Amino acid sequence: MTALYWQTIGEGERDLVLLHGWGLNAEVWSCIQALTPHFRLHLVDLPGYGRSQGFGALSLAQMTEIVLAAAPPQAWWLGWSLGGLVASQAALMQPQRVSGLITVASSPCFAARDEWPGIRPDVLSGFQHQLSLDFQRTVERFLALQTLGTESARQDARQLKAVVLNQPTPSVEVLNGGLEILRTADLRAPLAELNLPLLRIYGYLDGLVPRKVAELLDAAWPNSTSQIVAKAAHAPFISHPDEFVTMIEAFIAAH
């Protein structure tokens, strides 16, 4: 039986599940240790990533089912980028177990469609093709894209790269599966029906999730809350950890 890597830290009474993004692992959350006095943090390496080896390419529903199987019975869920889709899917599949949902630099539909801003599908397909040719360079390029434009871009990209290199790396099959989820998932309609506290955090400079998404979802999901970190890109918790932690604490405390 292939098992997921989970780690629980923190002294708080509320449970908070943290889900990382594509290509990364749970070590990416080390910069927000300030949450530990307030929450019991449940850190997981998604199936096939980091220390959760032995999985192949999975659909969004399959990945979410595997995570839910070992997640705490009741918790807040926070997901970054691809992890935001998994956290959202968990809330759709088992809403009774999700106290509230926080998505970070995430979109219910990452690919650009008709009137919807996002990553061009051919760019995502290109990444899939490049992975098979030059694994290391493609992952590095994707990490660099995540921090582009911020004052601390180089330093932040180095931090992300260290997270990848310090743990077992995902296979090309797993990474392609993740890109396929980003290319095809569209949770806009089902999430509009979700009746849970929902906070969406964005980076103003994010090149992967355009800030226009925040505005469109403000209109489509009026019961949700959005916050934009002015000088952040795709990893606001790395470039602006204090501001990020304050947002999380305030939102959960209010609910």
From Swiss-Prot:
Write out the entry's keywords from A to Z: Biotin biosynthesis, Cytoplasm, Hydrolase, Serine esterase
Q: Where does substrate bind?
A: W22, S81, L82, F142, L143, A144, L145, Q146, H234
InterPro entries assigned to the protein according to its UniProt record, in alphabetical order: AB_hydrolase_1 (IPR000073), AB_hydrolase_fold (IPR029058), BioH (IPR010076), Carboxylesterase_BioH (IPR050228)
Molecular-function GO terms, alphabetical? carboxylic ester hydrolase activity; pimelyl-[acyl-carrier protein] methyl ester esterase activity
Q: What class of enzyme is it?
A: hydrolase
GO terms for biological process, alphabetical: biotin biosynthetic process
Location within or outside the cell: Cytoplasm
Q: What is this protein's function?
A: The physiological role of BioH is to remove the methyl group introduced by BioC when the pimeloyl moiety is complete. It allows to synthesize pimeloyl-ACP via the fatty acid synthetic pathway through the hydrolysis of the ester bonds of pimeloyl-ACP esters. Also displays a weak thioesterase activity. Can form a complex with CoA, and may be involved in the condensation of CoA and pimelic acid into pimeloyl-CoA, a precursor in biotin biosynthesis.
Name of this protein: Pimeloyl-[acyl-carrier protein] methyl ester esterase
Instruction: List the lineage, top down.
Output: Bacteria, Pseudomonadati, Pseudomonadota, Gammaproteobacteria, Enterobacterales
